[in-house]
């Protein structure tokens, strides 16, 4: 009986070691960004793949690779313990409202994983550009100025405007080139009027809408708090 118990305990120990090895191997496994469990694809078409990144405080991602050109906007402010593949991890401050761009075509694919140190949930919207760069793209081609909107990103592939509206304020009519993606930075209420059609929308953080064509619209903040939008424009 004692020998049988010892044999069972030894078998259990070996199983635990095997499971631990599999978990460690899985921790090192690299997946495309759109297959990482907390990078959720919310829209995919011929132009873009829109990824909603949501990481609760204290949780981490798998190693994942950004292999496509990738504009993004940070929706919340946190500290990430970020580890680029093959390097030591280090803290990186994320500031809500920051609009960035990773040029994978020029710099090569970027592989990393991170832990969200908080405070709170990390939230971001990333936009993978599905089409390769145009051969006739002109570096530094200007994004058309829009009265009442701030240009926060402008390169040969994509631009972005930031729009802020106080309660009761309106902007427009303004023309946004298409295709475009509008991202809400927080809660609020927005009315937009396009060709005499008025639409009321209750906004939430990281909510977005894709417009395949150029649109001319008037925006009105119909809520009690400031509305902030980031409008990405594809070139």
Positions of predicted regions on the chain:
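A short glycine-rich, His/Asp/Glu-containing loop-to-beta-strand
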Residues: 37-62, 66-72, 144-182, 231-232
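Short beta-strand His + acidic residue motifs that chelate non-heme Fe in jelly-roll/DSBH
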Residues: 61-63, 81-82, 102, 108-117, ...
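Glycine- and acidic-residue-biased ligand/ion/polar-headgroup-sensing regions
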Residues: 67-86, 176-196
């Amino acid at each position: 009986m004692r020998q049988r118990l010892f044999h069972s305990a030894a078998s259990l120990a070996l199983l635990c070691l095997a499971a631990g090895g599999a978990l460690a191997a899985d921790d090192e496994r690299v997946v495309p960004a759109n297959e990482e469990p907390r990078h959720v694809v919310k829209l995919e078409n011929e132009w873009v793949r829109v990824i909603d990144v949501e990481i609760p405080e204290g949780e981490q991602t798998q190693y994942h690779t950004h292999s496509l050109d990738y504009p993004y906007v940070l929706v919340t402010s946190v500290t990430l313990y970020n580890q680029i593949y093959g390097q030591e991890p280090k803290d990186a401050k994320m500031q809500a409202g920051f609009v960035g761009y990773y040029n994978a075509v020029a710099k090569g694919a970027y592989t990393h994983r991170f832990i969200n140190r908080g405070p709170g949930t990390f939230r971001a919207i990333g936009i993978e550009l599905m089409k390769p760069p145009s051969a006739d793209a002109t570096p530094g081609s200007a994004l058309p100025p829009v009265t009442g909107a701030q240009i926060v990103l402008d390169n040969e592939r994509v631009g972005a405007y930031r729009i802020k509206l106080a309660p009761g304020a309106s902007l427009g009519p303004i023309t946004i080139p298409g295709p475009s993606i509008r991202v809400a930075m927080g809660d609020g209420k927005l009315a937009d009027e396009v060709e005499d059609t008025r639409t009321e929308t209750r906004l939430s953080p990281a909510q977005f809408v894709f417009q395949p064509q150029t649109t001319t619209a008037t925006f009105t903040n119909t809520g009690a708090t400031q509305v902030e939008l980031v409008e990405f424009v594809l070139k």
